[in-house]
UniProtKB/Swiss-Prot annotation:
The gene is NETO2. Residues 1-22 form the signal peptide. One of its GO terms (biological process) is regulation of neurotransmitter receptor localization to postsynaptic specialization membrane. Residues 369-525 are cytoplasmic. The modification Phosphoserine is found at S409. GO terms for molecular function: ionotropic glutamate receptor binding. Keywords: Disulfide bond, Glycoprotein, Membrane, Phosphoprotein, Receptor, Repeat, Signal, Transmembrane, Transmembrane helix. This is Neuropilin and tolloid-like protein 2. Disulfide bonds join C45-C72, C100-C122, C177-C207, C234-C256, C297-C309, C304-C322, C316-C331. It is found in: Membrane. Accessory subunit of neuronal kainate-sensitive glutamate receptors, GRIK2 and GRIK3. Increases kainate-receptor channel activity, slowing the decay kinetics of the receptors, without affecting their expression at the cell surface, and increasing the open probability of the receptor channels. Modulates the agonist sensitivity of kainate receptors. Slows the decay of kainate receptor-mediated excitatory postsynaptic currents (EPSCs), thus directly influencing synaptic transmission. GO terms for cellular component: glutamatergic synapse; postsynaptic density; postsynaptic density membrane. Residues 296-332 form the LDL-receptor class A domain. N-glycosylated.
Length: 525
């Protein structure tokens, strides 16, 4: 009995184990069947496989019918100096329509939706072989709300570009050339490639600049300088802008003509790519990037009036960071950096040494000049003669009437004697003429004659003395009454001689240092 019960328990346990193991095996089998199958989100368009030499892609749900109201875009990119070759499988069906107005497949020669159109395809027949003229191809699949079909499956591969056969065919591997920038603003420069020697002279340029904005910000790009050596030849040189990553799907703009416009990115990561072949090394660009947030603006940001808020540190910094120059309007002109602000450490050292040398020489010169005059003054004091300086610098002392008393009295005595003799002679001559002639006309002539005689007498008297420089002149006037003779006939002109005015100018001259004086007498009637 006990053995039978034990056997029954073992059977139950065995059955339970087998059931559990069976369930586990079934679960593993189901999981194994799901390996390699990827659930495609509703927003993704089919399967796309990429390789270094090409790849393949298909319409959504291929080989089943594609969904209605679907739009998928595929952008193919080859390596530099290569083209793209596109082929389709035979299992192909897209709703046919006139000029493919409804469901269709659109292929363009380039990376954009506005690139040259190659053709539109629909119907039951697969498209022929398609080749691009450059390294990009833009493909769009579109379906409407009715009549879905099988769809398509396409393969693409990269082939050498025959336009570059003169350069040796396929391009040699280009060295890594990448740069990173971040912050509120900054400048992307193509000249950085040569400065950091990322490429060798004569080598093609294929460089990437990755820009990271400040947190929660987007990026605004503005070209400060732009020049393509071969304009409108995108195969040879271009500047491309990507929004979010360097993937071809995120290509925002591409410039290879003569003009480059501003670009607003929707994310905080921007990628700038420059391509220039060996013959386009003169191509260059310089680009300003600015981090911005959308309004409303905070206290730490500035409103640019163009749906932009930039950091306050970028206002009035001499650079236009807004799309319009609102941030640089109403700014006070900043003073230019002074001379001392521009002096570097080396300049300061040179100026300091030079100034020290000049200062030492100046001090030595001052000491020499201070000591030298003192010696000269000491030498002059020993040879100083007060008497000589007294004679040279003291003015001469003049005394009026410094004649000796004897000489003055003798001169005055001689002068008075001469005057008396002259008066007597004059009276006698006048009286005799008036008595004998009995007229007054002769008296006038006698007066004239007397004056003539007086002048003749005066000349030798004045010539006795030389004419030195006069020092002072004084006049002595003597009034004397004239004698009148009453004759039988009165003379009317005799009244002129009632008074005799005698002026005796005395002039004193000093000759040299001698105290001698001379006098001259002039008598006028």
């Amino acid at each position: 009995m006990a053995l039978e019960r034990l056997c029954s328990v073992l059977k139950v346990l065995l059955i339970t184990v087998l059931v559990v193991e069976g369930i586990a095996v079934a679960q593993k089998t189901q999981d194994g069947q799901n390996i390699g199958i990827k659930h495609i989100p509703a927003t993704q368009c089919g399967i796309w496989v990429r390789t270094s030499n090409g790849g393949h892609f298909a319409s959504p749900n291929y080989p089943d019918s594609y969904p209605p109201n679907k739009e998928c875009i595929y952008i193919l990119e080859a390596a530099p100096r290569q083209r793209i070759e596109l082929t389709f499988d035979e299992h192909y069906y897209i709703e046919p329509s006139f000029e493919c107005r409804f469901d269709h497949l659109e292929v363009r020669d380039g990376p954009f939706g506005f690139s040259p159109l190659i053709d539109r395809y629909c119907g039951v027949k697969s498209p022929p072989l398609i080749r691009s003229t450059g390294r990009f191809m833009w493909i769009k699949f579109s379906s409407d709300e009715e009549l879905e079909g099988l769809g398509f499956r396409a393969k693409y591969s990269f082939i050498p570009d025959p336009d570059f056969t003169y350069l040796g065919g396929i391009l040699n591997p280009i060295p890594d050339c990448q740069f990173e920038l971040s912050g509120a603003d900054g400048i992307v420069r193509s000249s950085q490639v040569e400065q950091e020697e990322k490429t060798k002279p004569g080598q093609a340029v294929d460089c990437i600049w990755t820009i990271k904005a400040t947190p929660k910000a987007k990026i605004y790009l503005r070209f400060l300088d732009y020049q393509m050596e071969h304009s409108n030849e995108c195969k040879r040189n271009f500047v491309a802008v990507y929004d979010g990553s360097s993937s071809i799907e995120n290509l925002k703009a591409k410039f290879c003509s003569t003009v480059a416009n501003d670009v607003m990115l929707k994310t905080g990561i921007g990628v700038i790519r420059m391509w220039a072949d060996e013959g386009s090394r003169l191509s260059r660009f310089r680009m300003l990037f600015t981090s911005f947030v959308e309004p409303p603006c905070t206290s730490s940001t500035f409103f640019c009036h163009s749906n932009m808020c930039i950091n306050n540190s970028l206002v009035c910094n001499g650079v236009q960071n807004c799309a319009y120059p609102w941030d640089e309007n109403h700014c006070k002109e900043k003073k230019k950096a002074g001379v001392f602000e521009q002096i570097t450490k080396t300049h300061g050292t040179i100026i300091g040494i030079t100034s020290g040398i000049v200062l030492v020489l100046l001090i030595i010169s001052i000491l020499v000049q201070v000591k030298q005059p003192r010696k000269k003054v000491m030498a002059c004091k020993t040879a100083f003669n007060k008497t000589g300086f007294q004679e040279v610098f003291d003015p001469p002392h003049y005394e009026l009437f410094s004649l000796r008393d004897k000489e003055i009295s003798a001169d005055l005595a001689d002068l008075s004697e001469e005057l008396d003799n002259y008066q007597k002679m004059r009276r006698s001559s006048t009286a005799s003429r008036c008595i004998h002639d009995h007229h007054c006309g002769s008296q006038a002539s006698s007066v004239k004659q007397s004056r003539t005689n007086l002048s003749s007498m005066e000349l030798p008297f004045r010539n006795d003395f030389a004419q030195p420089q006069p020092m002072k002149t004084f006049n002595s006037t003597f009034k004397k009454s004239s004698y009148t003779f009453k004759q039988g006939h009165e003379c009317p002109e005799q009244a002129l001689e009632d008074r005799v005015m005698e002026e005796i100018p005395c002039e004193i001259y000093v000759r040299g240092r001698e105290d001698s004086a001379q006098a001259s007498i002039s008598i006028d009637f």
